[in-house]
Amino acid sequence: YGGKVFVDDIEVRHVEVDDLCRKVGIVFQNPFNQVTGSKLTVYEEIAFGLENFGIPRDEMIRRIDRSLEELDIVRFKDRAPFDLSGGQMQRMAIASIIAMEPEVIILDEPTSQLDPQGSEEVFRAVQRLSRQGITIIMAEHKMEKIAAYSDRVMLLDDGKLVDFDAPGAIFSRNDLKEHGVIAPSYTRICRELGIKTKEKGQYPVTLEEAGALLTYGQEGTV
C-alpha cells in the first residue's frame, strides 16, 4: 500500500508528533497495552499524558475530573488501574485520551477483548463523546454495534474503500458477503422476509427498526 495521510489538511510526515498528538488521540485494541504501569491510581494514570504536555495543575485537574465524569468512572479514580475490569480499563484508556482534548479519537477494535457488558459500556461512552462534537473513527467487527451506534460506515476490502454511507445503506448492499461482511442479524432476517423501509428501500439494521417494520409492515417508515 502507498499514499499520504493528512490530518486537518496537513500531511502528517511534515508535523511533529507532539503537535499531532494534540489533534488526534488513539485508543488501542488491548487496554493493557495502553496503561503505563507506573501509576498507582486511575486518577494518576489519566494525568500522565497531561503531565508530559506540561499542562498547568488547575487545568489538569479540570480535565481529569471532566474525563472521569464523561466515562462514568469517577468511583474508580482511587483504584489501581490493573484492578479494573476490561470494560472499565478501556474506559480509563479513553478518558486518558479525551483529557488531552483532541479533535479526533481513533479506536482500534476497542471491544474485541471485552464481554458484552464491557462492550456496551465502551460504545455508550464513545457515543456520548460523538454527540459532543468529537470526531470518532473506529475499526470494529461487531456489526450489530456498528449498525446501532455509527453515523456513517466505511466498507473496506483489501485495504480499498468500497463504500462510505449510512449504516442502512451499507448493510442493505447485496454484495456484502463478497467483501467478507455479514450484515446484522436483524437485517438478515428482514432480507429473508423481503421487508424493507418504503421510504428508502433499505433493510432495518437495529432491533428497534426491525420491530417497527415487523409490527406495522412495509408501509411503516423508520
Describe each PLM feature range.
Residues 80-84, 88:
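Conserved ABC ATPase signature
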Residues 158-159:
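Conserved ABC ATPase "signature" C-loop
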Residues 172-222:
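ABC ATPase nucleotide-binding domains
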